[in-house]
């Protein structure tokens, strides 16, 4: 597969990536999606299981329908876990016009085969590869964890052709940012221990 030419180094891409929640209406073409998936499957994987599979959704009506299904399920799950009492507010999820996918034109689901011992970790490594590739290509991305309760219902899995032995691990929206992407500052690494080599080690 011909790969796009990018100007950023890998470290510049890591520092530039951030979650994007405002998108242009411009669609992401299928070739670009294929490149993102190619980046994803080159992630590290435990004992070479490669337990991932993907669903690509670009249908606006379906995306809105999934958003509407996800909002009440996510709020119910958050309340059950007591997240509102932990200082989180979920009022925006109660607004009919709020789209949890932020009107992005593309949603990519990274699904994991649950029989693989490290399927969740592997899928998240694939997710980071995908998001870094998107950033390097001038695209924005964002993990939409609030969609998970809806995406993993039996009804939705049948609709999206997700087998019973797979679950959605990382729902990622992708699109062209409607704003300038400004890198965010992060805290310095918390080093719990720094054990130098001994004289004989």
Predicted regions and their residues:
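Small-aliphatic-rich amphipathic alpha-helix that forms the alpha element of a beta-alpha
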Residues: 40, 108, 113-158
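Glycine-rich phosphate/pyrophosphate-binding beta-alpha loops
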Residues: 41-48
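Glycine/small-residue-rich phosphate/adenosyl-binding loop
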Residues: 50-121
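Arginine/glycine-rich "motif VI" loop of SF2 helicases in the C-terminal RecA-like domain
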Residues: 135-136, 163-165
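Short proline/glycine-enriched turn/loop segments at secondary-structure junctions
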Residues: 157-163, 180-183
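A generic structural signal for short coil/turn motifs at secondary-structure boundaries
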Residues: 23, 116-120, 181
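A short N-terminal beta-strand-loop micro-motif at the entrance of redox/enzyme domains
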Residues: 20-35
